[in-house]
Amino acid sequence: MLNPIVRKFQYGQHTVTLETGMMARQATAAVMVSMDDTAVFVTVVGQKKAKPGQDFFPLTVNYQERTYAAGKIPGGFFRREGRPSEGETLIARLIDRPVRPLFPEGFVNEVQVIATVVSVNPQVNPDIVAMIGASAALSLSGIPFNGPIGAARVGYINDQYVLNPTQEELKSSKLDLVVAGTEAAVLMVESEAELLSEDQMLGAVVFGHEQQQIVIQNINDLVKEAGKPRWDWQPEAVNEALNARVAALAESRLSDAYRITDKQERYAQVDVIKSETIATLVAEDETLDANELGEILHAIEKNVVRSRVLAGEPRIDGREKDMIRGLDVRTGVLPRTHGSALFTRGETQALVTATLGTARDAQNIDELMGERTDSFLFHYNFPPYSVGETGMVGSPKRREIGHGRLAKRGVLAVMPTIDEFPYTVRVVSEITESNGSSSMASVCGASLALMDAGVPVKAAVAGIAMGLVKEGDNFVVLSDILGDEDHLGDMDFKVAGSRDGISALQMDIKIEGITKEIMQVALNQAKGARLHILGVMEQAINAPRGDISEFAPRIHTIKINPDKIKDVIGKGGSVIRALTEETGTTIEIEDDGTVKIAATDGDKAQHAIRRIEEITAEIEVGRIYNGKVTRIVDFGAFVAIGGGKEGLVHISQIADKRVEKVTDYLQMGQEVPVKVLEVDRQGRVRLSIKEATEQTPSAAAPEAPVAEQGE
């Protein structure tokens, strides 16, 4: 018999249900979590034994959305779900980031978390539900995991924090912040904001952490009722004698190496020290494991860097804790792009371009929550040469997708609306050098490139990465961290914004015990760094260019009667296709009659506008037009009068005398003046050549051909 164990609780305006014991009973743990009809099924499987020689923690998080959850059938030839979308990849990272630090050091058994969205309420985003499910499943599994964690989304509407706002509420929110943490401390923050202050952002983090305690309590209660026994896992005993021997050989040399400011030179020296130390020790004792020795050396490296920072000594590259690396800012570096910038901060460099396109270039995204169109695209590329390595080049990896999304969040708050600037904008950041915080360099470069392209951004934005070293109550916050400081420190804290406030905040914390005070210090220090960078950027370009690039399409907007849209499009799109070919422009028509004509040449755009105005012009009864005969029938002729419209000239209206045969007076393609006699209810037009000729004596009336005289 299936005996599900269920916990139900109120979480803000939503009801959350945790259920286990019903499905996937061969998995290490499985939980179905639902929040007001959005349901995510999360499983965890952990291997009891680690693979021989395993020297890292192989945690995999897969998040997958099934279209049946929204009552849809997938598109595409195969009619089934394929590779993860960008959105699914971002949510998988969102789950991974707060749970990864909670596994004990030295635990290298393979663990896989799979979250499957099986039902979706369009107003309730599945990401928070999936995070709660992953926390519950890991806590139930018995795997050594120092959780559970809670997760909350925080909005800011009418100067009030809102817990887990609906999709509709988020449209009017100045903040979209996701926070996850344990009972004692915050572990992860991901957010975008409309230039809120440091205090407002910190308040949101604290609010979200306080509110999610009910999630942690209910998961703990579920574990008491249905949890599996804790695995009897113990870290390997520390070999103090070996640690001391390695330290004696390498510590002072590593300390000297970490005073080398050039990254590549430092890495080369550290590699030499490590390989020589391992070779010496293995020569003394062949039973020693090179991987174990490598881990000891890494711990020594970490201690060298951290102890120096905590003692108030200069950092790896000689800077003080709040110093920013040297900046070099250039715009307009590529001649044919619409906008470009090269932003260099120390050994981190981003070549960023901005490209303008039409509404047709916008990305149509079909998500589980519904369809949407994105007219601001941000792509981040991290080639292997940026860190002096060789490697695969191809489709973007999870990290590139995540960094691109963070950089996009940083810029989004200052972008103009589609009504203010009717272009699709694509920003591409090519990381050409990397030694820490390439995503924040991308924010700075994007701001510069957008201004260079003439995009009317509301303000310049800059980003900075902060780090933390903490031992006991002693802590130091570092500004503009290097890659090594990120790797060896306790926190990665990225802040982007303008002079007026924060547009994006991302925080990943590797230890427990990060207090509100520490976050306050980090935010305030980040503000000073951000303002310094903005000052340097403003020396290069302090406002958007007055005009867009000569190579960018210029969009001209006109309005037509919505009833005339069908005339401009034509049967099967024939008229609009002919127009685009004739004028060399791109033409887009919206349902409300807004017509956007895009062209790199102003004359071509004006030609297209004139032609559209001709097509959509109302036919005036009594007006005389110049027409062209398009068709001849027994009872008259059809004459085109411009704008794709034609009318009938009845045989009685061709001449002021009796006409026996139409072809005696008119030929195909002949140009004739015509007067509009009537437009009936069905839009049919009655024309007269006879009356047009009478009113305009100078117009040549068609005459019957004179019969040839026989010789």
From Swiss-Prot:
Residues 622-690 form the S1 motif domain. It is found in: Cytoplasm. Gene3D superfamilies: GHMP Kinase, N-terminal domain (3.30.230.70), K Homology domain, type 1 (3.30.1370.10), Nucleic acid-binding proteins (2.40.50.140). Residues 699-711 have a biased composition (Low complexity). PANTHER family: POLYRIBONUCLEOTIDE NUCLEOTIDYLTRANSFERASE (PTHR11252), POLYRIBONUCLEOTIDE NUCLEOTIDYLTRANSFERASE 1, MITOCHONDRIAL (PTHR11252:SF0). Component of the RNA degradosome, which is a multiprotein complex involved in RNA processing and mRNA degradation. Involved in mRNA degradation. Catalyzes the phosphorolysis of single-stranded polyribonucleotides processively in the 3'- to 5'-direction. This is Polyribonucleotide nucleotidyltransferase.
